[in-house]
Regions:
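WD40-repeat beta-propeller superdomains and closely related acidic/aromatic-rich repeat-like regions
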Residues: 29-344
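Sec-dependent bacterial lipoprotein signal peptides
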Residues: 1-30
Length: 344
């Protein structure tokens, strides 16, 4: 009798779960489709293939790196090209670049050589062959600390190279065990690095030594630093956390239910307690902090399977500007998008 009851109970449980599933499917089917999110401004800068893109601090300028040694800067307000540098001035095998916050200076790099550019005059401001310092390693990331003379290089050997061309001083610090893929300077001037080893480091620039570290299980794909030393860290599989680097503690975690998903670019909103992320493609999500709940979702324009958001900046507290690998610049009213979602 007990056995019969158990079988009956299991069967009933299966029917109940099936009924719940059917009701859920019907409810989802009856749910009205959300209104499409439209940009409030769009401009296709180019239809040429892009290696890299960067926006200035408030999104007023866009720098694009093209194959075969071409580097160009546009004024996004006037939609005019300000700088157009070509090979052989730009080394043909240049594979990465960085623009300082003011858009006055650019860094570009091959595997071993860094070039510095003055965007106001479209003239080279310096060149540095780091082969001797790198050894068998190569450049994997770069960023100005104080443009144009002071900058930092991440390498495939896990080293951080602090360079100052004015004083001709170079310091190599080893902390990572794999490629250093992210370098970022916080609003208050703190330097952070992240690598394919899952290590995130907050650096003491004066002593060229780590102040705090955080380790996540997999390679770091997204790194963003906001106010109050709050750092967003996402790895390649399932870790998306807010790290308070001053106190070295995790203060929030995104409620992200999909495994094997990751983020590429992220920005903290300047006024609202929000974090905005982009997927490896063009999906955009607004997250409510500190709860870590998603409150809105939309997609930037994609013109192909490989389209992705390469950078984003707030032009003002309410407007986010994105630039994609298709050369498309779009503006988004973030408050309006959140309001449309019904979560704001």
């Amino acid at each position: 009798m007990v056995w019969v009851f158990s079988v009956w109970a299991i069967t009933l449980d299966r029917y109940l779960r099936l009924a719940v599933l059917l009701v859920s499917v019907q409810c989802v089917a009856c749910t009205p489709e959300p209104e499409p999110v439209n940009d409030i401004g769009r401009w296709q800068i180019t239809d040429s293939f892009i290696l890299s893109a960067a926006l200035s601090k408030q999104g007023q300028h866009t720098a694009l790196l093209f194959p075969q040694g071409r580097l160009a800067v546009w004024d996004n307000d006037t939609q005019k090209r300000l700088v157009d540098l070509h090979a052989p001035d730009v080394l043909p095998d240049t594979s990465m670049m960085h623009m300082d916050e003011s858009a006055r200076y650019l860094l570009s790099a091959t595997r071993t050589v860094v070039q510095i550019w003055d965007a106001t005059s479209a003239e080279p401001a310096g060149s540095l062959d780091l082969s001797a310092q790198l050894g068998d390693a190569s450049i994997t990331s770069l960023r100005f600390i104080l443009a144009p003379h002071s900058f930092v290089i991440g390498t495939s050997g896990g080293d951080i190279l602090f360079a100052d061309t004015r004083s001709d001083e170079y310091h190599l610090a080893h902390q990572h065990d794999a490629d250093v893929v992210k370098l970022i300077v916080s609003p208050d001037g703190e330097l952070y690095s992240a690598g394919n080893d899952g290590l995130v480091v907050r650096w003491d620039e004066q002593n060229k030594a780590p102040e705090q570290t955080l380790t996540v299980p997999h390679r770091v794909t997204s790194l963003e630093v906001g106010l109050d030393d709050n750092v967003f860290v996402s790895d390649a599989l399932e870790t998306q956390v807010i790290w308070q680097s001053q106190h070295n503690e995790i203060i929030s975690e995104l409620a992200y239910w999909e495994r094997f998903q990751w983020f590429r670019v992220a920005r903290f909103a300047p006024v609202n307690p929000w974090l905005i992320t982009s997927s490896p493609k063009t999906e955009m999500i607004i997250w409510q902090l500190p709860e870590g709940n998603p409150i809105a979702q939309w997609w930037a324009e994609a013109q192909g399977f490989g389209s992705t958001v390469l950078d984003m900046r707030f032009t003002n507290p309410a407007t986010l500007r994105t630039v994609t690998s298709d050369g498309v610049l779009q503006d988004w009213d973030i408050a309006d998008i959140a309001e449309q979602s019904g979560s704001y």
